[in-house]
């Protein structure tokens, strides 16, 4: 089935041909964690998104994108796949301290217990906290809607403009620039996967993921 095919983050057994640029995949090493969602549309199958992730950074903008119901769905998906969630609230420079506190209060009201880091790609707030969380040999991913600043964050972590970023609109909303999944290696040996923004986020069975996502 399509679930058994390699996805980003998989470790595979390969046999190289005459040139090391060509190889055949013989097997996929069993996954220790995974990200999957319900296939778009009415299909009841699920789509494997990524594998072998240690920490998922769930990214939402404080300014235009924040939606606690969407955040809950991301948390269920991440916890179901045995991945540790960390919430990144971006664009804090575009909201007042009172507006930011309202966002944080809505998260607490939903009994969400995941770690939260507030970020601004303009002022650099929170960047060092994210960098300190990323350990050598571990794999991380960025999950969020289009335009919340994930590509800019990756470029900051890499220390260079390795990925294209979109112009920011007058509302502070970035334009969608990630069209495929990227896996990049940071200088310290941590691996980071950038995901395209998800227009549809469906969950098939939320039992275990639901239990792990919220306080009792």
Where are the regions a protein language model picked out?
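Helix-rich effector regions associated with P-loop NTPase G domains
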Residues: 3-19, 29-55, 83-85, 92, ...
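Short, charged beta-turn/beta-strand-edge "cap" motif at the junction between a beta-strand
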Residues: 16-21, 62-64
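Conserved C-terminal guanine-recognition region of P-loop GTPase G domains, centered on the G4
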Residues: 43-116, 214-216
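Walker A/P-loop
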Residues: 146, 150-152, 156
